[in-house]
Amino acid sequence: MAHTGKLQGPLLAECGEWVWEQLQEEGYQLSGELIDLVFETERELGIQTKSLDEIAQVLEEEFRMRGIQAQPFALDAALIKAILEWEDDFLGFAGISRAES
């Protein structure tokens, strides 16, 4: 499914980099590709307008079904929600609502 929201291209890349930097400062050691995967899967499934808790649960289950794992931190709902919370901050700075993203 083609992504048609406002958060795409260079802005999506900038968001991913910014979120990665914020998580690094919080002590998370994870690759930027993992953040990109969260953003891409969130939009692929069309769930970005749901609550952060619901998105995190859906993505945790989706990644489990796909056999996707992360180390040293588990790719669980708590980590996914942390990514989504920083994404929300970025969206706020960019003046984009989650529904428009």
Predicted regions and their residues:
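Amphipathic alpha-helical interaction modules
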Residues: E17-E62
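Amphipathic alpha-helical binding modules
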Residues: Q69-S101
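Eukaryotic scaffold/interaction segments
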Residues: T4-L7, Y28, G32, I47-Q48, ...
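Short amphipathic alpha-helical segments
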Residues: L11, C15, S51, I55, ...
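Short alpha-helix boundary/capping elements
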Residues: R43-I47, F63, G67, D88, ...
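Hydrophobic membrane-targeting and insertion signals
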Residues: M1-L23, A99-E100
